[in-house]
Amino acid sequence: MIKFEKVNYTYQPNSPFASRALFDIDLEVKKGSYTALIGHTGSGKSTLLQHLNGLLQPTEGKVTVGDIVVSSTSKQKEIKPVRKKVGVVFQFPESQLFEETVLKDVAFGPQNFGIPKEKAEKIAAEKLEMVGLADEFWEKSPFELSGGQMRRVAIAGILAMEPEVLVLDEPTAGLDPKARIEMMQLFESIHQSGQTVVLVTHLMDDVADYANYVYLLEKGYIISCGTPSDVFQEVDFLKAHELGVPKATHFADQLQKTGAVTFEKLPITRAELVTLLTSLSVNSGGEN
């Protein structure tokens, strides 16, 4: 689906202001996967994200998206199809809304790619239903809606382009806890429908709950990758790099360090933690 091979990126190359942001990145996003990218500000994850849909081209190495190869010498006309294959929901996407009605805003993208208005509006209606926005809102101005509803409109607008990969850049930033949970459940539902998803986040619990593969970035390098279950076992390594772990993992690790219990493998979700603690309680129940 998407493959990075020895990708390097330098801002303002061949100038006194040259600044290298990515170093020898090897990365793969498989079809149907839910992949997470984690890193602090300055880790390179935003630069990497912009390579996913051809907004940036590698200084060295190559990015393959489907059957399209993007390198330093690729022409814009060769890269343009990548932007239809990979849809990016940037932080605070509601700031990009502009049309006079919700339906028109969502239909704008498909029309921009040459789809007739009637068909574009049919696609828009399908995607608005998918993101859970009732038809009573479709003829309203997007600016009359709540923040969470506006974000759903923006996400529907990306989905209306029918991308093969949906990239989410800190998608719950600024939302209250209830809206945040609902938004993550929406993305899980979209993933379950067969959509390939890439999540850029700093929230480890979301990675544990939803992703099936994760890459950790630091200063432009991938410092760890694997399934969340494997990566989050390295608690001390993550702490040394000032990266957190899921709350359930932190609790279990602290409990284990007291000597009260030994886990064969640290849980990464609340459900896993409850199951393990219940099992321990049952096993020791005869002594109580």
Curated annotation (Swiss-Prot):
Identification of the protein by name: Energy-coupling factor transporter ATP-binding protein EcfA2
Main location as per UniProt: membrane
Complexes and interactors: Forms a stable energy-coupling factor (ECF) transporter complex composed of 2 membrane-embedded substrate-binding proteins (S component), 2 ATP-binding proteins (A component) and 2 transmembrane proteins (T component).
A GO CC term assigned to this protein in UniProt: ATP-binding cassette (ABC) transporter complex
Membrane topology: Peripheral membrane protein
The UniProt record lists the keyword Thylakoid: no
Keyword terms: ATP-binding, Cell membrane, Membrane, Nucleotide-binding, Translocase, Transport
Pfam families listed in its UniProt record: ABC_tran
EC number, as in UniProt: 7.-.-.-
Binding residues for ATP: G39, H40, T41, G42, S43, G44, K45, S46
